C-alpha cells in the first residue's frame, strides 16, 4: 500500500482538529463540570467539617454545662440536706425543750397543788389541835389546876433576870415597853380607871377560879420582890381566863396563861407554814426562770 504524504498530513491535521474539537466542545464541559462538582463537594465537605467542629464544640459546652449543673446540683442538694437536717434537729430540740418545759410546769403545778393541799391540811390539823387543846383546858380548868398554874407563874417570876424585872416593873408602873422576855407575858394597852389616889400602886390579880390565901400570899410576895416597892393587891375572878393569871397595875395589864402558849404556838406554826410556802414558791420561780 502506497503511503501518500499529503494524505498522512491531512489525516494528522484532521485528527488534531478532531481532538481540539472534542476537547473544546466535549471534554472541556465535562472537565469543567467535574471541577465544579469537585469544588462543590470540597466546599460542602469543608462546610460539613466546620459544622462538625461547631457541633463538637457545642457538645463539649453542653457536657461541660451538664457537669457544672451536676456539681451545682450536688452542692445544692448537700446544702439543702444539711439545712433540712439542721432544721429537723432544731425542731426536735425545740419540741423536746417544750415537752420538758411542759413536764416541768406540770410537775411544778402538781407540786404546788400538793404543797397547797399539804399546807391546808397542816393548818387545819394545827387549828383543830389547838382548838381541841383549848376546849380540853377549858373543860379541865379547876382550882387544883389553877394552883399549879399559879406555882408555874411564881417560878417564872422568880427566874426573871434583872433586866426582865426592870422591864416588867416599868410595864406595870409607867407602861409603854415591849415584852421581850417570854411569849407567855403580854403587855396590853392601858386600862382606864386603874390606880390608887393615895399614891400606892394597886395591882389587880385575876384568875378563872378564886385562889387560896396561900397562893395569893405567894404571888404578892413575888411581885413585891420584883417591883422593889410597896404595892396593894386586889384578887378577883375572871371566868373567861383559861388556866392563866393576869395582873393589872398602873393602867397596864400583864397576862400569863396557857392560852398564851397556844397563841404563841399557833403564831409560830403559821409563820413556819408561810415561810415554807414562800420558799417553795421562790424555788418554782427560779426553776421557771432558768428554763
From Swiss-Prot:
Belongs to the ATPase B chain family. This is ATP synthase subunit b 2. It is found in: Cell inner membrane. The chain crosses the membrane at residues 2-22. HAMAP family: ATP_synth_b_bprime. One of its GO terms (molecular function) is proton-transporting ATP synthase activity, rotational mechanism. CDD domains: ATP-synt_Fo_b. One of its GO terms (cellular component) is proton-transporting ATP synthase complex. It comes from Nitrosospira multiformis (strain ATCC 25196 / NCIMB 11849 / C 71). F(1)F(0) ATP synthase produces ATP from ADP in the presence of a proton or sodium gradient. F-type ATPases consist of two structural domains, F(1) containing the extramembraneous catalytic core and F(0) containing the membrane proton channel, linked together by a central stalk and a peripheral stalk. During catalysis, ATP synthesis in the catalytic domain of F(1) is coupled via a rotary mechanism of the central stalk subunits to proton translocation. It is a single-pass membrane protein. Keywords: ATP synthesis, Cell inner membrane, Cell membrane, CF(0), Hydrogen ion transport, Ion transport, Membrane, Transmembrane, Transmembrane helix, Transport.
